[in-house]
């Protein structure tokens, strides 16, 4: 992977990202806004899946998910910008790999939800309790996103990356 990181860091795009002093801070702001959307909305939905806020129909909680997806796309774009700008600081950082693991876990968990219990769970109305499988999916999702947040915040402190 270090060969790939060295190649990526030698590209014109990488040099542009680090050459202009406004790019990195702008991406940090956008990344934070995107993360706020993802954690806030996905966290709300996850808590509903876990059995909290039963007055809210599950489908109504899910209606906000397009905003969370927008936030995720903001994070994907800015995260890729960070990676292209300084790939060596990421590939050698345990916190980055832990963050990637949590992202993959969150994605797999969402796929499991959508392909197994999603349709049945969306039909639950106000006052209905969610099945145990939905509670587990919600807990794994919430833990995954909090892991993404935690490990992302640890990036500067683990491995002296920044």
Q: Locations of the language-model features?
A:
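Polytopic transmembrane helical bundles with strong interfacial aromatic enrichment
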Residues: 1-162
